[in-house]
Amino acid sequence: MFTRIGAAAYKKDLHNTIELCEALGNPQNYFQTIHVAGTNGKGSTSHMLAAILQEAGYKTGLYTSPHIKAFGERIRINGQMIDETFVIDFVARTKELTSKVEPSFFELTVAMAFEYFATEAVDIAVIETGLGGRLDSTNIISPILSIITNIGYDHMNILGNTLPEIAGQKAGIIKKDTPAVIGEILPITKNIFVQEANEKDAILHFAQSRYQVEYLEPTGNLLFCHVKDLQTNTTEKLRLDLNGIYQAKNVCTVLCAVEQLRALGYKIPEAVQQNALEHVKELTGMRGRWDIVQSHPAIIHDVAHNVDGIKQVLYQLKTSYPNAQLHFVLGFVKDKDVEHVLDLFPKNAFFYFTNAHIPRALPHEELRNIAAQKGLTGEGFDDVNEAIEAAKKLAGEHDAIMICGSFFIIGEIQ
């Protein structure tokens, strides 16, 4: 399975997913969907949209990956994780089918999610891609709206080494005669989306051309955000419980997506939208995005794991804790661009190198050696929680401890 093993488990075609779903009666055709792709921000965007839709009264499915603690995090309806009995029954019922098709773990979970949403008769489901878009297992749906949050460097061994190549894979979720929202715009990739949309008679909506963040202030566990609608020249004052400042980009994408949903007939009052954005964690169970779990010293969990994601959390650390001694509990998986990620970290910080207990994890000894070549020094730990305890013992009351680098590192925190 890709989650634990990595690129070796990735399959570059939709054959297995199509065969699985056809055998199940194509459950993905029995509910409306929104498809979300992007290098960073697709999980946050998916959760925000799901929160808004369910708060507006729609029975809302949500499929995301990977999970942090429990498998059920991947498949939710109105924030509630999939019933364990359904999972057990699904695996038992499809045993003969899976023996024949031999799907990957991800392919099987996609089919399971689609059948669960169909069985439970959701009104709509927000479906996050696993990797890329064009050949991702989720890309057998016919969404009413496609969303691409941004394009950055990640999974280059699979998606391509250039931003246009990566964009070309993400653009594959744009569908014929279907609106598509593009979050961040890069001059080098914009034409990729325009060309794909033209070929499919899809209408593109660029969030950055419609919305602009005028004011941004993280305060405790909330992010205060003023967003200007450039079309109506009005400003909406929002409070987000997803309080990483990088969420400002995502919220513009979400607002643009909600406008398209309203145009499609979905009734989403402004007050409902505002309340949902303030309670995303409560409504959808989202975790791992700038979670401040302690104040003195500050302890923050974030699943940031690539160059763009790490840049964002380091910027917020610098602005939120300008005088603090920084401590980093770090662990990565083998297929990440660790060398370039480590170039971003301050050399005067304390480091605690560790690894999750999965085959795909980069051993902490190897991570420590790479870091030493970058001028970053610290100790190595076999266990994530041992690394955290070491950081807590050394950190002063006014220091800040950042735990990041992988979903799996966050998942092993006790």
Predicted features and spans:
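C-terminal helical cap/extension that packs against the catalytic core
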Residues: 186-196, 201-205, 298-301, 307, ...
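Nucleotide phosphate-binding/pyrophosphate-handling subdomain across enzymes
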Residues: 119, 124-129, 137-147, 151-155, ...
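ATP-dependent carboxylate-amine ligase catalytic core
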Residues: 8-14, 19-29, 55-141, 157-159, ...
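Beta-strand->loop->alpha-helix junctions that form or flank phosphate-binding loops
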Residues: 183-184, 198-218, 240-244, 274-280, ...
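Charged, amphipathic alpha-helical linker segments immediately N-terminal to NTP-binding catalytic cores
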Residues: 1-8
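A conserved segment at the C-terminal end of the G1
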Residues: 36, 44-61
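Acidic, Mg2+-coordinating active-site environments of NTP-dependent enzymes
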Residues: 103, 125-128, 147-237, 251, ...
